[in-house]
Amino acid sequence: VQARVGRRPPKQRQAEMKFVRGHFYFLVKNHFKKVPYIDEVISQDSINTVSNVQYSNNDLWNKIAEDFQFAADNLPPQAEQVGRPDTYTAKAYLAKLRLYQAYEQDDNNNVTNINKERLNEVVTLTNEVINSGKYGLSDDYAKNYLWKYENGKESIFAVQRSLNDGSEVGRIDMSTALNYPMYPAYGCCSFHRPSQNMVNAFQTGLDGLPKF
């Protein structure tokens, strides 16, 4: 492992780490909105004093975006190993972040403005990802959930499960594992099932446009 790591330039290793940091901060911000931002410049003694409102909503999006931008600028177009991000992975994440950021909110979570400049950035980034030719839609949606098709062309970034690493069940992302259908043998979980109201919200007319 050390030999493989040593072959990658320092900037590329930094980009991988910043991408992962951006990945987790994006998830945390998406869930909680106002979160403390702790990076390498914060001393160990200062961590407990960092406020979750040190940055505005927009500024915090920008802080997270800096990691994705650094990753996009310093990662290769093709990763050396499955599970590592590349420049298009970072651009896809940056596009998703800018899409969220474009819908500007007040402190009560009301949308106060739709930033067209950010939306144009989303279009530019997603076009770059699409035109890379690396991704596409599977011929069968179910393949996205079958192990023999893992890391398929619909997968932008997937945490790889490890085996025989000393842990009880291997390193696995339980946040997504909880989404599998309820089944007696599992005794769980079937989270995040769409309601009929949600389905209705996405109904379209014959012209393909949503019914509001």
Residue ranges and their predicted role:
Residues 37, 80-81, 138:
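Secondary-structure boundary/capping residues
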Residues 34-58, 104-123:
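Short coil/linker segments at helix-helix boundaries
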Residues 16, 36, 154-156:
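Beta-sheet entry/capping signal
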Residues 69-70, 84-212:
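An aromatic- and glycine-enriched ligand-binding surface/loop that stacks and positions planar moieties
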Residues 1-32, 48-62, 66-82:
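Conserved, well-structured interaction surfaces
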Residues 41, 79, 161-163:
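Short, flexible loop/turn elements at secondary-structure junctions
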